[in-house]
Amino acid sequence: MNQYSEFHQLADQLMLYIEETLDGFSGDSDIDYETNGGVMTLTFENGSKIVINRQEPLHQVWPATKAGGYHFNYREGKWFCSRSGEEFFAKLSQAATTQAGEEVSFG
């Protein structure tokens, strides 16, 4: 498997996990998601969004949240922020919880 197809497989798995988690979300908030052209958009009741974009040339996933944008690299079986070292789903849970106004956990 070449490096680009491996990256796409890992990014697909990441987005599928997000979809499955949101499909099973039992909170009061309505969180919609849409994936188009490798870009996933989460839309919250208050109109705020989280956009998760693939950066194929860099082999990174870039989520943009209300609080800011982040770059994540895949290593040791997980995605980690290139600046803080924080794990992807921890950061996504934090951002989604803030934007939904209730706890949203992806991990």
Swiss-Prot record:
Pfam families: Frataxin_Cyay. The keyword Plastid does not apply. GO terms for cellular component: cytosol. Keywords: Iron, Metal-binding. SUPFAM superfamilies: Frataxin/Nqo15-like. The keyword Metal-binding applies. GO terms for molecular function: ferric iron binding; ferrous iron binding. InterPro entries: CyaY (IPR047584), Frataxin/CyaY (IPR002908), Frataxin/CyaY_sf (IPR036524), Frataxin_CS (IPR020895). One of its GO terms (biological process) is iron-sulfur cluster assembly. Gene3D superfamilies: Frataxin/CyaY. Belongs to the frataxin family. Involved in iron-sulfur (Fe-S) cluster assembly. May act as a regulator of Fe-S biogenesis. This is Iron-sulfur cluster assembly protein CyaY.
